[in-house]
UniProtKB/Swiss-Prot annotation:
The lineage of its organism: Bacteria, Pseudomonadati, Pseudomonadota, Gammaproteobacteria, Enterobacterales. CDD domains: AdoMet_MTases. This is Ribosomal RNA large subunit methyltransferase F. GO terms for molecular function: 23S rRNA (adenine(1618)-N(6))-methyltransferase activity. It is an enzyme of class 2 (transferase). The gene is rlmF.
Amino acid sequence: MLSYAPENAYQRASTMENKKVFPKEKSGLHPRNRHRSRYDFDALSVSCPELIPFLTPTAYGDISVDFADPLAVKMLNKALLKHFYGIEYWDIPADSLCPPIPGRADYVHHLADLLASCNGEVIPKGKNIALLDIGVGANCIYPIIGQREYGWRFTGTDIDSHALSAAKMVVSMNPTLKNTLRLKQQKDPHAIFEGVWAVNERYDATLCNPPFHGSAEEAAATTRRKLHKLGKNEVAAKPVQNFGGKNSELWCEGGEEGFVSRMVAESVAKAQNCFWFTSLISKKTTLPAIYHALRYVKAVEVRTIEMAQGQKVSRFVAWTFLTPEQQAAWVAERWA
């Protein structure tokens, strides 16, 4: 058992009465998700000793971290990435989004299943499979997971030059990413694919975690609600940053609906250069507008893949302009 003087979280937790028994697995996560089991803080702390000072006993006699503390969440992510994905160096600016890794991993695994559904239920793997991550951020989460699990090659784009500088450091310090993740800056804040997608480039899929909110005020209000649920009554002067995330990561004009609608419109110009376009959709109420946009551009096939993590339900929408015959030709050329 881990120990550190003068008193450690494990010792404090072990003395608590009425210790609550938690299920061994988290409900709803994808079967291949490495994070289905509850966090093993012993193992994580061995992989990343920097996590130890952030461990604390809970009211139920368990061990956890304070999820309202951005430094604790950041260190937990660092430990998870090192322990499960072999990432030796990972750091993000203080004001960058620190995403929940189990949920991000679910998106990658369900996307792999989507590709497999067009390939005789065999997941296409290796560097020949190219994905475009819109809004890669400083954290590089999707490329890290996709490369480790399936050997995929990624291009990551972002409008934030500071985020890309941090991402470039992550790439340079991890050999597995050097030849599998290329970073590009989107210099037009109103464009999504235009300017970062060359005429001759082909992608097997795109993925995106779009800005959720329609304004900075809306983003701040959501963060205050999260803090309240976690029992944190104090509201910081800049509440948006408590959970991480710059303006471009958290909100944009039109919010999630506006961003994904623009993505749908831009995807028409790349119709024959991509098999599946996809985007996370956090709000179920966003779906009707996205379906309407997809009907307008005459997408050949549209799928909605639901995901769950405990009581939280999310989904991503996928669309393609390829006919069944074109899909078969794509698979034969690129995935065989």
